[in-house]
From Swiss-Prot:
The family this protein is said to belong to: Belongs to the class I-like SAM-binding methyltransferase superfamily. rRNA adenine N(6)-methyltransferase family. RsmA subfamily.
Pfam families: RrnaAD
Highest taxon of source: Bacteria
Protein's UniProt name: Ribosomal RNA small subunit methyltransferase A
Enzyme class: transferase
Function: Specifically dimethylates two adjacent adenosines (A1518 and A1519) in the loop of a conserved hairpin near the 3'-end of 16S rRNA in the 30S particle. May play a critical role in biogenesis of 30S subunits.
Main location class: cytoplasm
EC number, UniProt record: 2.1.1.182
């Protein structure tokens, strides 16, 4: 087959470093009967070693040229190809059994894709993703740091996350202009409390971080007032990045009990 030309509109940077590939597969630790879904298999850097360990693998791919290449290289009884956009894909449709999801995620859609994947937290055992290093730093950030934000709160509410591997630009072809890393995400329901209305929690967090430099008192106007915050022992003069995930959950539940809905 002719050499595939990476397509910028799909955010294609193909992994080619053998030690990084081995590190990712080791982290995923696939067992023969696992139901594994790979997002964006590309030229098969992770696909091939996964297939060597699995009875069957599912992949989600949007690029028609890559789909044809995958069909030519792998038998259908080993590889199921789901053609389409991962942002719109129903991962739960693959199997009723627990899922493992892995992928070198396109950096140009990483944040919306992470929010989409987070909705499957109750269907997965773990997820491992290659992402822009700065995105992973936001995912695992601590309160009162510049990286702590909406993405942090909503993902840490659902998952335990760990930055497990640094990946330099030269590990890819073509090399991206940024450093990359690999994150492990393990569902951890209830680790930061349980929201009675997750849509309300999402609304609260989104509004709180709408203007990072403003205080909670200002950002939450129309949703929560100073009295709501003070009732929970939260200083209305704090900025949103100062508030731990647990306090966002407590505030969402307080507002829910007063009749607010997402």
């Amino acid at each position: 087959m002719s050499k595939h030309i990476p397509r910028k509109r799909f955010g294609q940077n193909f992994l080619q470093d053998a030690s990084v590939i081995a590190g990712i597969v080791h982290a995923v630790n696939p067992q023969p009967d696992d139901i594994v879904i790979e997002i964006g298999p590309g030229l098969g850097a992770i696909t091939k070693p996964l297939l060597a360990r699995l009875k069957h693998l599912h992949v989600v791919e949007i690029d028609r040229d890559i789909i044809e290449r995958l069909k030519a290289e792998h038998p259908a009884d080993k590889l199921t190809i789901h053609a389409g956009d991962a942002l719109a894909f129903d991962f739960a449709s693959v199997s009723e059994a627990p899922l493992k999801i892995v992928g070198n995620l396109p950096y140009n859609i990483s944040t919306p894709l992470l929010f989409h994947l987070a909705s499957y937290g109750n269907r997965v055992t773990d997820m491992h993703f290659m992402l822009q290093k700065e995105v992973i730093e936001r995912m695992v950030a601590e309160p009162s740091t510049a990286d702590y934000g909406r993405l942090t709160v909503m993902l840490q509410y659902r998952f335990y996350m760990e930055n497990i591997l640094f990946v330099p630009p030269e590990a890819f072809w073509p090399p991206p202009k940024v450093d990359s890393a690999v994150v492990r995400m393990i569902p951890a329901p209830g680790r930061c409390g349980t929201a009675r209305d997750e849509a309300l929690l999402e609304k609260l967090v989104s509004q709180a971080f709408a203007q990072r430099r403003k205080t909670l008192r200002n950002n939450l106007k129309g949703l929560a007032d100073a009295a709501d915050l003070e009732a929970l022992g939260i200083d209305p003069g704090l900025r949103p990045e100062n508030l731990p995930v647990e306090d966002f959950v407590r505030l969402a539940n307080h507002l829910h009990d007063k009749g607010a809905r997402g």
